[in-house]
């Protein structure tokens, strides 16, 4: 194999299967060699981590092949939609680093879809059905048994046209009539058994108000909207595989049987994102919010993009994660640890290192001059050779972590214990001399002596010492609230666990959720101390509290009351727990 062929082969192997399809379509000249995609969210909730995978695919394909990705809101159900969701969706997409070509709405095409439905009725391809939803469900049959025709299937065209007009005029109550496509009640594909394409909804629409009372169903609106916009590659998840023949049929019909092999959208499916310890159903997330089990859609424990953003995840870390898991044609449960690993990898390269003490005990350097204060130099990020530095004040009295001192330590304890030396990061080597306890035997002060010749940068500072501790000066620090967030669920597969609990106990989704919630998903610490460098920190600043984990200021944080959220611990502790 030549060097060029080897390179081409390597590039070919690196393409995911959707990219291979797109390249094949381009090579064959389909749709005039154009690539156009769309991201079509329904504005009925906040985007979650599962949507991020679809966003990266839709926008990524368009960018890679010089095309455009449009944003189209699938606003065909006014009972659940709101402008609030529209704005949050746009914010999340931009936060991920993408910009859409055009902003569209399915409601932009309501008139075209209506006209198309009228044409289908006139052509004998659609009819108004007056059966109840229960009757229609039974009449559709089963995957192994054909359906039976509706008694209204062959009603006169003029009658269906008249009733369809009444549906939209508000003269028909919700649930009393629907418009169905006339296809094949014996088809092995259940979606071909005269699917409902219009229903009555009297709730005002957030864009069109009371103009429409008859609304198109997703399967009817989606493919046609793709066609009207000029979408070439309609990318969606695997549950839509059975819908594809219907998608193609409706596109054939809207094209009136002309030029069927070109200038049309084609649907391709990839696996959706499934994560351990995560529940992604919008319906269940809404229960969490409404019942107060979390503090809103942007609660840092939520799998929403705004929740991850508030928790301190960077958009780049989510891109890294999506790249790692890739796109396939089969569903799998991905380990949440993979996402956290991507976050750690990204934040390690970008987070500013700072000192924070979460469980403080006072350390007094008995031989350090009283009243003396030194400014120590701390590198913001040692991973960056061009990293700036900041200063941190050092004095006689310091706060250290309570777990960094042990009066009677085991042999391999390398932190602070009487007679043992440790290094205070960016400062001096000190030797512990003892401690002071209260009446209950609790340590309230630790004592040590510093070696003035071991300041960071001095020759003696290179003396071999196994333990290095972080600290902040008692008189030169800021008090802070720290929120230690962890996984919301204590079960690996909350979706399956919830189904099992509900079946076993015949209980509601809410009751099942309460059984699965991790009681340690949020631990709030009030008596924490951070260095003064963080006085001006703001949300979306990426920080590493040295030796503890990655953190970010919360939106609740103020100069008078600093609040920090833990993004992720420095190491994966859940893997150890799950092995026990």
Region roles according to the model:
Residues 1-13, 580:
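Basic/polar N-terminal segments that are highly enriched at the extreme N-terminus
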Residues 13-90, 204-237:
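N-terminal catalytic cores of NTP/NDP-binding nucleotidyl/phosphoryl-transfer enzymes
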Residues 29, 58, 89, 120, ...:
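Residue-level signal for inorganic ion chemistry
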Residues 40-43, 72-80, 102-111, 134, ...:
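Conserved short loop/turn motifs at secondary-structure junctions
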Residues 71, 75-77, 83, 105, ...:
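Active-site cores that bind ATP or allylic diphosphates and position pyrophosphate for catalysis
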Residues 85-111, 116-119, 124-127:
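A glycine-rich helix N-cap at a beta->alpha junction
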Residues 262-342:
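Long, charged, mostly alpha-helical binding arms that flank functional sites
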């Amino acid at each position: 194999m030549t060097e060029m062929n080897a390179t081409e082969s390597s590039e070919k192997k690196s393409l995911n299967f959707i990219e291979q399809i797109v390249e094949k379509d381009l090579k064959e000249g389909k749709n005039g060699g154009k690539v156009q995609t769309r991201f079509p969210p329904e504005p009925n909730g906040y985007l979650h981590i599962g949507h991020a995978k679809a966003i990266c695919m839709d926008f990524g394909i368009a960018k890679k092949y010089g095309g455009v990705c449009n944003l189209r809101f699938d606003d065909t159900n006014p009972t659940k939609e709101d402008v609030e969701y529209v704005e949050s969706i746009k914010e999340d997409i931009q936060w991920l680093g993408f910009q859409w070509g055009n902003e569209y709405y399915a409601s932009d095409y309501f008139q075209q879809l209506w006209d198309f439905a009228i044409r289908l009725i006139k052509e004998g391809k659609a009819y108004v059905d007056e059966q109840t939803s229960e009757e229609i469900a039974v009449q559709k049959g089963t995957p192994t048994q054909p359906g039976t025709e509706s008694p209204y299937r062959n009603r006169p065209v003029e009658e269906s046209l008249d009733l369809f007009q009444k549906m939209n005029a508000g003269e028909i109550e919700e649930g009393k009539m629907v418009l169905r496509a006339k296809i094949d009640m014996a088809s092995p594909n259940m979606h071909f058994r005269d699917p409902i394409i219009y229903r009555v909804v009297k709730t005002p629409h957030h864009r069109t108000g009371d103009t429409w009372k008859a609304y198109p169903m997703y399967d009817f609106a989606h493919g046609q909207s793709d066609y009207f916009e000029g979408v070439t590659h309609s990318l969606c998840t695997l549950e839509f595989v059975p819908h594809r023949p219907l998608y193609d049929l409706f596109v054939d019909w809207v094209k009136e049987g002309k030029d069927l092999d070109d200038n049309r959208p084609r649907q391709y499916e990839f696996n959706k994102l499934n994560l351990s310890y995560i529940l992604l159903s919008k319906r269940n997330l809404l229960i969490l919010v409404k019942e107060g089990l979390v503090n809103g859609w942007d609660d840092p424990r939520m799998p929403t993009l705004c929740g991850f953003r508030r928790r301190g995840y960077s958009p780049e870390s989510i891109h890294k994660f999506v790249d790692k898991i890739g796109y396939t044609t089969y569903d799998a449960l991905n380990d949440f640890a993979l996402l956290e690993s991507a976050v750690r990898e990204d934040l390690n390269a970008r987070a500013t290192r700072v000192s924070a003490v979460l469980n403080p005990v006072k350390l007094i350097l008995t031989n350090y001059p009283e009243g003396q204060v030194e400014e120590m130099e701390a590198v913001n990020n040692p991973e960056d050779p061009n990293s700036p530095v900041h200063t941190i004040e050092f004095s006689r009295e310091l706060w250290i972590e309570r777990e960094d001192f042990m009066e009677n330590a085991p042999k391999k304890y390398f932190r602070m214990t009487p007679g043992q030396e440790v290094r205070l990061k960016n400062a001096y080597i000190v030797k512990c001399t003892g401690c002071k306890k209260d009446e209950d035997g609790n340590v309230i002060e630790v004592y040590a002596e510093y070696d003035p010749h071991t300041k960071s940068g001095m020759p003696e500072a290179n003396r071999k010492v196994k333990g290095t501790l972080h600290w902040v000066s008692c008189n030169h620090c800021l008090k802070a609230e720290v929120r230690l967030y962890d996984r919301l669920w204590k079960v690996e597969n909350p979706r399956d666990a919830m189904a099992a609990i509900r079946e076993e106990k015949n209980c509601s989704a809410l009751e099942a959720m309460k059984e699965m919630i991790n009681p340690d998903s949020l631990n709030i610490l009030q008596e924490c101390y951070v260095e003064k460098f963080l006085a001006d920190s703001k949300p979306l600043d990426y920080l590493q509290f040295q030796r503890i984990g990655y953190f970010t200021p919360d939106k609740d944080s103020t100069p008078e009351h600093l609040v920090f959220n833990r993004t992720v611990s420095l190491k994966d502790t859940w893997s150890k727990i799950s092995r026990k």
